[in-house]
Amino acid sequence: QAVADQLNAAMASGRCEGMSVLAQRFYDGFESRPNGAGATSEIAQASVAKQIGYWWATQVAPPVAANSKTYRAMTPVQITNEIINGLRARSGFTLGLYSSVGGHSVNPIAVTKDGDNFNIYVYDNNYPGEIRKVVVNSASQTWTYGAAALSSGAASSTWTGTGAGSMDLTSM
């Protein structure tokens, strides 16, 4: 019970990891959307609340945490290359972003190159129906994500990160 209480307390600050993992699993075909919903944003919270909590909690499971640790040792450009390779192979990931403000999880859906910058286009469950982007500067090994928020409805700001440890991936 103590572990469950700790997980519930931690989950109170946001469920983005559970939501992004479940959204990716829907997209990859590992899970079926309930009630015939055509898009993740059309799903009623009550029908997926337990799944969101379950997938959120898996981030502390030893195999998932070890996988995350491997990715956190990579630079932003190395993470970007992993995303590119994953998109080509249709291997889904969630992308974790860590700044001085906190952490957030999004779903990478495309990557483009523009000079020294890579644009990682993402689905952010705080902004249903919108495509956002994380800009990675390959020269400085930094990233920027405009209008990031810790949870839906929370105040947003521009987040930035530098070097290894500021991003990670969760493999599906």
List where the protein language model places each region.
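Cysteine-nucleophile protease catalytic domains, especially the papain-like/related folds used
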Residues: 1-77
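Residue-identity detector for glycine
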Residues: 14, 18, 29, 36-41, ...
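Intrinsically disordered, low-complexity regions enriched in small/polar residues
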Residues: 24, 28-29, 56, 73, ...
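General "foldedness" signal
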Residues: 30, 108, 134-136
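Active-site-adjacent substructure of cysteine-protease-like catalytic cores
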Residues: 71-122
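Cys-His-centered catalytic/binding microenvironment captured across papain-like cysteine peptidases
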Residues: 100-103, 112-172
